[in-house]
Every structure is written in C-alpha cells, then in structure tokens.
Amino acid sequence: MTRLALFLLLAIPALPAQQSGHSPSRNIEAKEEASSQLDSIGVVLDPTLQFTDERGYPFQLRQLFPGKQPVVLLLGYYSCPAMCGQVLDAAFRALSDVDLQPGEHYRILNVSVDPKETPAIAKARKETFLPRLRKTGGEDAWRVLVGDEANIAALTKATGFQYYWSKLTNQYAHPPSLIFLTPEGKVVGALRGVEGMGT
C-alpha cells in the first residue's frame, strides 16, 4: 500500500453509508450486493478504457498508467445531491493536511457513473471543489471524467464499485469509497465510507 493510501485510510474515519440525479439511459438491474464496494485488491485497470475530461478532451487511462505517481480514484456522479460531494470534500481536507503535493506525489481521478453527464457538468464540479484542495498543482493533477456505459461498466466492475438506479428515489444508489491505485494502475486499497456522510 502506498504512503498516500495509508495516510488517507487513517485520516478519514470510515462510516458505512450509501446515497443514491437524473434518469440514466437504462435502469441498472439491482442485485442483492448492489450499492457496495467489493474487494478488488490486486486488480490492474485496463489502460485502454476511454473517457472524456472536463475540458472536453479524450482521456484514456493509459495517460495515467503506467505513470510515476499513485492515483486516488473517486467514483460517483456529479449531480449527486449530497454524498459524492461529501466524499470529495473529506478527501481534499485530508490531502490538504498531508505533506505531499498533487502532481508530484499523487494524482486524483474522478469518474462519473452516469453516462448522461457531460464535460460541462464535470467542469462545473471541478470549479466548485478545486479551491478546497489547498495545494498548488491541484488543477493539473486532478482530472474529472465522463464516459459511455461500456467504459463506465468496465471500470466499475474492475474496481468492485457496485451501484444501481433507484426508481424509488430517482437517484443512483452507490457506496461512498475512495480507491487507491499504484502508478501501474493496480488497486491496492479502498476506503469504504467517510465520517459525516448521510444517506
């Protein structure tokens, strides 16, 4: 486990929770184990997975893996009414307290699980939260991505991030988690839950 992953695991108290935006292109079949973070330690992400970043540019995971820095991966969606923002805020508060610089020592990757979200939505998300990462280099070290269903499904399956569309709440139900990746794109840890998050 990387120094960064270990620090965040210790710095952010865990509290199991789940939260469910707008209607997806199709309903995700809810399973018994849906809306949970499964153990995916040791899995290496496919570097050919293709997304679009907050600037509207194509972004393949090979732009990060293999690389020189570990990566903190956050999955969720940007129109999430509460929890996704709370996870990001808690992560940024912890990262602001550690003696490591974004871009030099680690990178941050946000990926939306909602295939209807656009680069403009991703850009707005970044503009809202970037000031909370009180570190120089944060803008270039943090990519905020959107993608199609196929690439989203491949990424979430590989990382063990399970979610579904709730017709009851008209939102995505998903686990709060941070996933830690080596510079080679291998999953080495996950933080399941962040203190202070509600359902």
Question: Model-predicted segments: where are they?
Answer:
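Cleaved targeting-peptide boundary
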Residues: Q18-N27
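Short active-site neighborhood of thiol/selenol oxidoreductases, capturing the structured segment around
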Residues: L61-A91, I108-N110
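Sec-dependent signal peptide recognition
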Residues: M1-F7
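N-terminal "domain-start" segment that seeds a small globular fold
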Residues: R26-Q63, Q86-S96
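Structural microenvironment flanking redox-active thiols in thiol-disulfide oxidoreductases
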Residues: L88-I152
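Thiol/selenol-based redox catalytic cores and closely related redox-interacting motifs
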Residues: R132-T199
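Extracytoplasmic
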Residues: V44-D46, P66-P70, G103-I108, E139, ...
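Hydrophobic h-region of N-terminal signal peptides that target proteins for export
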Residues: L8-Q18
